[in-house]
Amino acid sequence: MEQFNINKGMTIKPGLDVLPPPVTDDEYRALMAGEDRYLMTESNTLEEIEATFFYDTPIHWCATDLLEAISSTRLQLHRTMQAFVRALNQKLNGTGISAGSDKTGDVAQSGARAIGGAEIGRARNVNGLPVLPAIIPLSDGQTISILFHSPTAENRITNSDTLVAFQFLLNKKDVTHTVAPMSGRDMTLAQVTMKLANLAEKNSAKFQRAQKKKKALVDEITQLQADSDQKEDAMSDLADQVAAVEGQKADLEQKINAVASEADSLYEENERLQGEIDRLNRTGGRDTIAPAGMTGGHSRALTDRLASIKNRMHMDGEATLSNGASMKQFIGDGEGYIQLTDPDGSVYMIKAKSIQGVDMADAIGKLFKAYKAGNVSEYLVQPEEHKPENVEPESAEDTGSSSPEPEVSVGAYRYALQMRPAAPGAIPEGNKAILPRPDEGDPYYEYARYGIATYDTPLSDQQMSEYDLKLLPREDSFDFLAKTLTNGPFGKYAQKALELATNSPDEFRVMLKTQFQKTFPNIAFPGGAGTEKMVQSMINALQAEVGEITQPEPAPAQPDETVSEADAEANKAIEYLNNVMDMQSTDMAEIRNARGNVREAIAALQTAGRFEENEELVNGAARHLADLLVAIQKAGVAA
């Protein structure tokens, strides 16, 4: 608000003014100029007048007499405001705007009173003089405010005290000197109300636009606040879900620990019982040990446990038995083999169904049981059959030099150095040779970043994982790898996979690479031209599989060996645990059901006495389900 100077006051008296002057455009533009022009588009309230005028706006009081404006007494204020509102409505006729309030009596909560079409506020002392505000509302939302002071009152305004109007506001803008610019001259009521009516009419359109923008802004802020509250509620719900999943994870880990503890107890008990069985087998229940069975002239007093042998073979790729015999596993021409060398030099060998860990473990068990029972003659290998494999000679390129370079002797098994160069401690011991990185067009160029390490004997899965090595298969093993994939993940969908290879070759390559890396995590997938050869081998294997399905061969003869009911249930349990390892689900109910089925599988393995040899598979399935729960938790928080 502008400062008021009583030297510029004037007298407004009732009288006849035939042509009262209207507000000019220049006068209106002057009011809309300056930093406080926004006050013209903000309606006023008694509370805001009291806050700004009574407390924040200074008034210059002078020693001269205050000139009379609209004057009345507190007792006659009702009639005075009625007359003023009536005159204002006459000037507003035809503008579509009307003045005055139809309220009467006290206004709730504000302490004001509605009289004569105006709302009268409470009197306050300003610089020692009592001041009384009044607001006349307009129908378009604007307000006209009039400020009265009482020159006769001391501390409080009584009914007989004189009230003098000395300041006018349109909305929040002080328009006193626009409404009554004739300093020192008398003005009629018609002149004042004409000026106020003109200002209200000129300002109405801008006021309505400003109020519309203000309402839109307020609605937007309200909506944003509601959205913020909704998102906070959603975050709170997600936090509760995270806490619930964490609790489920803790319960699962506790159950896994309980199963592991129980497995340890069973392992110790099995060790004790196995020792008793071995002792009884050696002595026949007598203190004097009878001669053990002979194979090739050497005693076969074996005290080894099959689970222990499988574990050592998995970790080291070889194992030494208690009677001095040795077992090892290796891959030749893409086929998996288990070899047992007796202390007398006899060699026994069995071929695994595939190079996958489960099939290799089955072959280990079959050969060991036959050897322990003395029925191993069918696996005897003639000397010429188990000679060391001939290493394919590397054809040296003709460099034009008169003296040929020495031929490098390399091992039969090649492993890509992915993460670090060959150095002591960086690769497993026993390597035959280190080859440089192949040319860029080589199928394994991307894998062998630091060259290729070769070995005469295959490395175990654990060694390849610990040293970040990848077995580089040769082209002659592609058919075997493709056949293994066909019997594995592609078995149920051979026909559809073959159609995909024909209709969408690119998608088939992606699917083949994904399943290859999942089935053979420690074997490199060939790139470049090698990819096309691998794809062709896979197509050939799928075509053969589809042909076998179309024209099935006669069922093979049933083996003589009968499987007990407990072993049959254990086999089903092992198959289910393998399927759990491939499970990819975001359904909490499905995962909970899987957890219950895993517990039933554990019980089946324990009943058949095969829990220990499949303990790693059980733990892997439990960890996989726990990882699925954690993935669901992370996905929920990101959302």
From Swiss-Prot:
InterPro entries the record matches? DarA_C (IPR041501), DarA_N (IPR041140)
Kindly list the places in or outside the cell where this protein is found, as annotated in its UniProt entry: Virion
**What is this protein's expression induced by?**
Expressed late in the viral replication cycle.
Q: Where is this region: Disordered?
A: 382-407
Q: Which UniProt keywords apply?
A: Capsid protein, Coiled coil, Host-virus interaction, Inhibition of host innate immune response by virus, Late protein, Restriction-modification system evasion by virus, Viral capsid assembly, Viral immunoevasion, Viral release from host cell, Virion
* Role played: Internal capsid protein that is probably ejected along with the viral DNA and prevents degradation of viral DNA by the host type I restriction-modification antiviral defense system. Plays a role in directing proper capsid assembly.
Remarks, miscellaneous = Phage P1 Dar antirestriction system is composed of Hdf, DarA, DdrA, DdrB, DarB and Ulx. Hdf and DarA are incorporated first in the procapsid in a co-dependent manner, followed by DarB, DdrB and Ulx.
Could you tell me what this protein is called?
Answer: Defense against restriction protein A
Q: Which organism is it from?
A: Escherichia phage P1 (Bacteriophage P1)
Name the encoding gene, please: darA
